[in-house]
Amino acid sequence: MRRRLIALSLLALLLLLAGGATTSSAKSKPKPKKAKKALTAKQKLAKVKHFVVIYEENHSFDNLYGGWEGVDGRTKAPAGRTTQVSQAGTPYTCLLQNDGNLTSPPLGASCTDTTTGASFSSAFTNAPFSIDQYIPATATTCPDPAHAFSFPNGVKNGSGLPGGCTRDLVHEFYQEQYQLNGGAQNRYVTGSDSIGMTMGYYDTKALPIYGYLHAKGHPRYAILDNFFQAAFGGSFLNHQWLIAAASPTYANPPDALRSIIDSNGMPVKYPLYNPTGTVRRGPIAVACPSPVPGRACGDFAVNTMQPTYQPFGSFGAKLVPQTNPTIGDRLIAKNVNWSWFAGGWSNAAGVVSGPGWTNGSGPNCSDANVISGSKYPNCPDNLFQFHHQPFNYYAAYAPGETKRAHLRDEAEFLDVASASSGKHCGLPPVSFVKPLGEENEHPGYASEPNGSNHLVTLVRTIERSACAKDTMVIVAYDEFGGQWDHVSPPGQGATAGPHDEWGPGSRIAALVISPSLGAPFVVDHTQHDTTSILATLEHRYNVAPLGTRDAAVRDLSSVFLAKAAH
């Protein structure tokens, strides 16, 4: 009995010790950490402290980024939105060319077209073609800046500067609507002064920006393949929509400034287009009622005009000062600092000794690249584009006004970003960056690869600074530059989405760079237009929308939901 009690006691002791060891072991184990809850897209947007909008020039998505992996690019274009048709609706056999480096001769003709009434020979069939194959980056086809607008059909290879420039292409309000053809995307050739050039595209993978974003250690980025220019037409109007989501007004303009369109909505004759009636290519919309249903009419500026205030150019009529609200006004009211940084601004605006100033102390402009006839201190570069400075059209930003201080030189942006080290980013919360003409990628007067190199410089400067940790960089092209794209914009044909009589127009190239993206490289297929940039700023800083379009579109926080490309 005694032995049995001793055995039971020992067993109890062993169980107690085992239990104690188990308890002690359990206590020594660290408690598992709670999984960190993923931030929503809205929360990620709220954590962005700096926005940098780099506004490049004149390229449709297919023309520039159509060869990027994972996107709705050129290889996915259906024949019905690729094959170009004549004014009568007949598919061309060949592409007629008038860029001096694409005509036959000098190129050998391998195609004959008899669809236009007068036959022509060409080296190009009716299909998209590689520009690089005929005008590589090394081609000496770029104009001297002093004569940049003297070569309507481009500079012959061997007689210009290196850079692989092409001729310019028309990109205007009424013409683009004809080119889109209700979403058929098949009248880019017929509705253009540059005809077959509209179907050219660049080797996406040869672009400097592509190389930078595929190099080891590249920043996280999104490519947006469903992003459209806000308004039909050109740079002037789309810069206005970038800052105001509205078309400029001009009450009771001189009649000579009004556009006149024919029954097809076209205002001009081109090599493959013959007007059906009286036409006039003007900066102001047609008089109401519009002769073509759905075409905008009234007292609105739709094509390039000059600002009233310096700096302004000598070509074209001046637009009366604008007074409607802009995103700049909205941000100022919320005490959010911002700046428009433009290449060449100090020289053009007469900011003597300011960042980027290169014209000495007077009494004459001394920079060799100044526009001939300029009077000191307004010494604009030959390729300074006055209509790319949208705030300068507004009375609130006139010389002498307090808000004028928000208009600065791109050189200052680079200086401030470069000097941002440690934990401090010296950039304002919102920066718009507009490169000078030589560096903005615009066909005709700028080299695409050189402009893309400058874009890399801008992005790299940000990414190497203290700003990189909380900055969203938005790279967008202002408009299509007259170049074909296969995706129908909202409001064209059966394509749904926010639209009105002003746009959106063709799909354009766009990128977003942010450390908060879900993967090193994502593709965002969400539908956007240029006013999505405004919506992003409006939502981030809780300011009222400027118009109906920016109130309706998706903002760019959608990039935080985008998936990695496969």
What do the PLM-derived regions correspond to, one by one?
Residues 26-566:
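N-terminal pro-sequences and low-complexity stem/linker regions of secreted or lumenal proteins
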Residues 9-18:
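Bacterial N-terminal signal peptides
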Residues 1-9:
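Bacterial N-terminal signal peptides that target proteins for export
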